[in-house]
Design a protein with these regions (language model features):
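Short acidic/glycine- and proline-prone juxtamembrane loop motifs at membrane-interface regions
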Residues: 1-7
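Membrane-interface transmembrane helices that cradle and orient dolichyl/undecaprenyl
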Residues: 15-30, 135-139
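Membrane-interfacial loop-to-transmembrane alpha-helix junctions, especially the N-terminal start
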Residues: 30, 67, 138-150, 196
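Helical-face signature of the major facilitator-like transporter fold
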Residues: 31, 35-39
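Transmembrane-lumen/periplasm boundary regions of multi-pass, lipid-linked membrane glycan transferases
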Residues: 40, 51-143, 155-161
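Transmembrane-helix signature of polytopic, lipid-linked glycan biosynthesis machinery
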Residues: 149-167
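Hydrophobic/aromatic-rich transmembrane helices and adjacent perimembrane loops
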Residues: 164-191
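Signature aromatic-anchored transmembrane alpha helix within multi-pass, membrane-resident enzymes
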Residues: 188-200
């Protein structure tokens, strides 16, 4: 885990808490707090854009509600200084990620990606998580968001590895929803609880 991952994990956790509150009750302050948490995520690391994207597509009906646009306005206002800096410096970060890092297809990058993810997430958790993912269905909007973020990050960066090297920690934000879902899956399954206590 690199330094930017620490605030990313922290504000990612805050975001999920506030998103839960927002889905349960949409009002002015929940929208403002959600917007602030998204801005703080974006300032932490650009992978946060993916997190928010996967959450949004997991709940497209949310886009019909006015308060989600208030959250978007709050985020946009807080991101103005960052946008101004990029305009003044010819968008160096976007140039680096979208142009400079692009390479020709090399199978070794994809083959590196898979074992690296086992190292990040622990194979004793990742493999059972994938099994449970297919055996269980989400029960509410919050769990649906966890599904989309967990799977979305792993699939997105697997595809990204087809055009360049993917650092192992780029998917670390998915550990938050992944662990929450894993614990949700096993809470009524004694055999899985025994596995966790014994192996994990």
């Amino acid at each position: 885990i690199t330094t930017p991952d620490v605030p990313l994990l922290f504000f990612g956790t805050v975001f999920f808490i506030l998103y839960k509150k927002f889905t349960e009750k949409q009002n002015f302050w929940n929208a403002v707090l959600l917007g602030i948490s998204v801005a703080l995520l974006f300032y932490s690391k650009y992978q946060a854009v993916l997190l928010v994207f996967f959450v949004v597509i997991s709940n497209l009906k949310m886009l019909t509600k006015p308060y989600i646009y208030l959250a978007g306005i709050v985020t946009s206002l807080l991101m103005i200084p960052h946008l101004m800096w990029h305009i003044e410096h010819d968008f160096p970060t976007f140039q680096y990620h979208l142009v400079d890092r692009s390479e020709k297809f090399k199978i070794k990058y994809f083959l590196e990606y898979l074992p690296n993810q086992f190292a990040v997430f622990n194979p004793f958790i990742l493999i059972p998580f994938v099994i449970l993912l297919f055996k269980n269905k989400y029960q509410n909007l919050q769990e649906k968001a966890y599904y989309f973020v967990s799977v979305g990050f792993l699939v997105f960066f697997a595809l990204t590895s087809l055009r360049g090297h993917v650092e192992p920690h780029w998917t670390v934000i998915a550990s938050i929803p992944m662990m929450i879902l894993f614990l949700q899956f096993i809470k009524e399954k004694p055999s899985w609880q025994k596995y966790v206590r014994t192996i994990v």
